[in-house]
């Protein structure tokens, strides 16, 4: 049974984290403005993430200031790249782990339908519970392997797909591109060696019918932006 059909795990509900001084200015520098209610919900998410991290490995970053910078700000750098998505558009976050960047995006863009794909059952159960605790009715969770979902019922089902800290681009591109429709966006959050990985993975782009658009700097690295340019290649028996 998928985790989003189960009763959510009971989660501790600690006091929300408050953003560090100057955080609104940091957001403005990347072209993002959020109201106080959204900021508060992001702080609520971070508090729950750190509380549950004491029971399961969700993040190696545990400093209350660093999580705003390296998790929230890093994730929200994707927001300006998603402006073309209208209300009701579908976004998949592959290998979501503790919910990054999918949950901050779902909090900031409640008009999007966000699917978090996480194969580890414990982490998927956390995602279900935290989405329920935050009242995120626009979030669903699939506790299955992305390799299978991208070939199955979620193939071509999304307008955009994101992934963060999942693997090198030569592996990540074939994993993520199948989820989006033709002309759909693929946004991959990488470290400082993104260009090196792009060169390594250049041959994969043509095979996956994907085109490189640009890279965008984040507080911790770069976002690689791709756009799917065609339908999925047909697979023939025996190949």
Curated annotation (Swiss-Prot):
Species, as recorded: Sorangium cellulosum (strain So ce56) (Polyangium cellulosum (strain So ce56))
Predominant subcellular localization, coarse grouping: cytoplasm
Residues that coordinate or bind S-adenosyl-L-methionine: 95, 100, 118-120, 146-147, 164
Record keywords: Cytoplasm, Methyltransferase, rRNA processing, S-adenosyl-L-methionine, Transferase
Family, similarity comment: Belongs to the methyltransferase superfamily. RNA methyltransferase RsmG family.
EC category name: transferase
GO cellular component, one term: cytosol
Pfam family, one: GidB
Catalyzed reactions per annotation: guanosine(527) in 16S rRNA + S-adenosyl-L-methionine = N(7)-methylguanosine(527) in 16S rRNA + S-adenosyl-L-homocysteine
Subcellular location, record wording: Cytoplasm
Record function comment: Specifically methylates the N7 position of guanine in position 527 of 16S rRNA.
Name recorded for this polypeptide: Ribosomal RNA small subunit methyltransferase G
Stretches that traverse the bilayer: none
Keyword Transferase: yes
Keyword NADP part of the UniProt annotation: no
């Amino acid at each position: 049974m998928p985790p989003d059909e189960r009763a959510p795990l009971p989660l501790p509900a600690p006091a929300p984290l408050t953003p560090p001084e100057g955080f609104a200015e940091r957001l403005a520098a990347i072209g993002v403005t959020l109201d106080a209610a959204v900021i508060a919900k992001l702080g609520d998410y971070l508090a729950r993430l750190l509380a549950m991290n004491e029971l399961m490995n969700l993040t190696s970053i545990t400093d209350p200031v660093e999580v705003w910078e390296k998790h929230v700000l890093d994730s929200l750098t994707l927001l300006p790249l998603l402006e073309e998505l209208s209300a009701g558009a579908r976004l998949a976050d592959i290998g979501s782990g503790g919910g990054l960047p999918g949950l901050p995006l779902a909090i900031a863009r409640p008009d999007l339908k966000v699917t978090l794909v996480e194969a580890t059952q414990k982490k998927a159960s956390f995602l279900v519970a935290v989405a329920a605790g935050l009242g995120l009715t626009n979030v669903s969770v699939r506790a299955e392997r992305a390799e299978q979902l991208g070939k199955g019922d979620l193939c071509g089902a999304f307008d955009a797909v994101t992934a963060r800290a999942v693997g090198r681009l030569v592996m990540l591109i074939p994993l993520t591109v199948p989820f989006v429709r033709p002309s759909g966006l693929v946004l991959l959050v990488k470290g400082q060696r993104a260009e090196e990985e792009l060169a390594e993975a250049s041959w994969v782009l043509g095979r996956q019918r994907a085109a490189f658009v640009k890279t965008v700097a984040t507080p911790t690295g770069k976002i690689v932006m791709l756009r799917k340019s065609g339908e999925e290649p047909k697979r023939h028996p025996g190949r």
